[in-house]
Structure formats: structure tokens, C-alpha cells
Amino acid sequence: MEDMYDSFAALSASESEYRIIYEEKNGSELIVLGPHGGRIEPGVSELVRAFSDRCSIYLFEGLKQRNNRSLHLTSIRFDEPLALEKVNDHHYALAFHGYYDPKIPHTLVGGADRKKAKLICERLNEAGFSAELTNEKDRLAGVHPNNIVNRTKREMGLQLEVSTAQRNALFRNFGCRDKSYIQNDLFDRYVEAVKLGFYT
């Protein structure tokens, strides 16, 4: 599906029901971000926040009652100024995204940092999760230099595309619109597996 806007400037001129969250982890070279958080891609914000123990975090969250899809800016177009500044301040970046597949719990691991992507994929598999390293030519590979996650000091980052079914499996009440999602044991196991790869 095409984005409604082609830049953050265009989006912010027409939309107001969103919020931007940035929490600095002093001295950390790591940042974890969710450019499609809140109601844009449900479950992404919770995953990002789970990394605040050792990472700076950035979230762009949709807050609309409906049609949060209009707040979606594809990662290579995601040029929100604070995100650009803060990702560029860090050496390592990991972005969580959600893709639509309500049947198969799965994670597509990509980004220009292929070495760490392979490591995260292996750690997820070892923890019992279905995950695969994206082909660099795949639509969701996340290797484009303009992708927000690759705009680090090292000019590379990591992108995790998590299916609807996998996100659903990580919470007791996924899809409940008016309540905070309650994380389950699987959530903790998933996050721990990603951390083992990312923090190495």
C-alpha cells in the first residue's frame, strides 16, 4: 500500500494525532526505534521499550482512533528531524516493524548490518522462533542507505519485520484498542533472543 505522504513535512502539515518519544541512554552507542509505533503497527512500541535497559529509544506513534495507516512513512522516506539526528548520533541501530500475516508467526531479519542480522536470526531460531535472514533484494530487506535505520555513524543498521501472528503471540491481549498490551513469557523470550544478537 502506498504512503499517503512522501515526507515528514507533508505528514505533519496535515496530521496531528501522533507523538514522538525519545529517551537517551547516556553513553550508549545503541538505539532502538519504531518509526511506525503506537496504532500504526501494533506491538512495535512495546518491543522497542523493552530495550531501554541499555539503549536509547525512539518512537513515532500513531494515536488516531482509526486509519493510522495514513501516518505510515516508508523507512527510506522517514525523515523526521529528531529521528535523523539521533540515529546519526549512534553507532548501532535496530528498528522494529510489523508486517501483515495473521497466520504464521515469523520474523524477517534485515538491514545493512548483515553480520549482526545473521546473528539475531540465529538467536531467534535457537530460542524456538521462526526467523529468516532477508534476501538483500527483498522488498523488506532494509538495506537501502536512505532507510532510517542505516543512517548511523557506521551507515548500517538492523531491521526486524515481525508478522501480525508473531506479535499477537507475544501479548495476552493483542488487538485490544483501549488498553495497554500485557506482555507474556514468550515476549520476554523473544526480546532476550534479540538482545543476545544485538548486544554482542
Curated annotation (Swiss-Prot):
This is UPF0714 protein YjqB. Belongs to the UPF0714 family. Pfam families: Gamma_PGA_hydro. It comes from the Bacteria.
